[in-house]
Amino acid sequence: MVTIPKILLILFSLIIGANAYGNEWQNIIRKADGQKVYFNAWGGSGIINDYISWAADQVKNRYGITVKHVKVTDIGDVISRLLAEKSANRTQAGSVDLMWINGENFKAMKENSLLFGPFTQKLPNYQLIDTENKPTVLSDFTTKVDHMEAPWGMAQLIFIYDSNKINYHPKSMQELLSFAQENPGKVTYPAPPSFYGTTFIKQVMLEVAVSKDPLYLPVKVSEFAKTTRPLWKFLDKLHPFMWRKGKAFTSGAPEMKQLLNDGEIFISLSFNPNDASNAIANGELPETVRTYIHREGTIGNTHFVAIPFNSSAKEGAMVFANFLLSPEAQLRKSIPRIWGDPTVLNVNKLSAKDKSAFARLPLGVATLTAAELNKVILEPDASWVAALEKEWQRRYQK
């Protein structure tokens, strides 16, 4: 009897497994051909809309998939629609095939069984994701991803200022308060539930909290008032010195950018480290604009795409999600003039050609280096979002 060496058995099993994996993906590609994917995603940025249009053209030409960008203002409205479809027992032929999502919205979809999956382990490009150095690709606002959404890009809160208008910038929220008191009317932030406004108050809360520990656990109603007291105390001090004396707030980062350009405010914000450089290149902001983060860091996270449970084009959605993770698509997304959205890939896992292309990416004049952006504060538990927004509106939106 011939004994097969153990190493050959291992190699044989690996080959069989790889073939099965490859065959499954080829079947997905075949089924995706001719499908129409309704991609529900925020439509408030022209450059992002253009990028999505480019990506849609690529999968149309290569795979025969039609991607329709359904521009939405608040992805929470889409979740409400999916909940209604589930209540009506519409388990197939849903109105949404793919959605841009993260944080509390992902948590809500996961808890209400509105997600298709797990699926990301089936995507060939998933193996290129930097799961080692980017923990937020695996944990979304403390909610385990569990292969139920595919990482798309990275984000970190940055502040924008015009170096021609101010000689220094604050390096903490306490310094921002002092800055506002010294420059009345020149500081503001968007009103929650604007994503930017909610992020701003979360940043405040993380900086002024007596202890951060409760913020990384689900909200306890009995402890909410005590835990958030330092936040409201800080905002009560800040608002009288803000733009329009804190009686009115901007709608989002784009409006803040315009106010910064007009000289009405001295500090704006963004969740894209390349945003200011893009704005300079597009003529939206002067060349003297620069960016910074706080001394102890700022909130950072990952944004994802997810497939609803009743998608009528699950295969097409998976192929599109896989393309969005390709080195080609991630590189283009990282170019400042295109979007400037940081990659979720581990560049060291890429081919020499792709690695070189990422290394040659231009760093805009107002863009912080990776070393300068290395202090990332993890998002609080997703349950804090709704609780903070509700209390903020009760206090200040009268």
Predicted regions and their residues:
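Mature extracytoplasmic/periplasmic domains
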Residues: 298-299, 303-372
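Short, polar/charged alpha-helical segment
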Residues: 25-33, 40, 45-66, 159
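Short, well-structured alpha-helical segments in soluble
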Residues: 82-91
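Bacterial N-terminal signal peptides
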Residues: 6-17
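Extracytoplasmic/periplasmic substrate-binding proteins
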Residues: 243-306, 310, 356
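Boundary at the C-terminal end of the N-terminal hydrophobic targeting segment
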Residues: 18-22
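Conserved C-terminal helix/tail region of periplasmic/extracytoplasmic solute-binding proteins
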Residues: 24, 258, 365-398
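Extracytoplasmic ligand-binding site segments that recognize negatively charged/polar headgroups
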Residues: 42-54, 70-79, 92, 96, ...
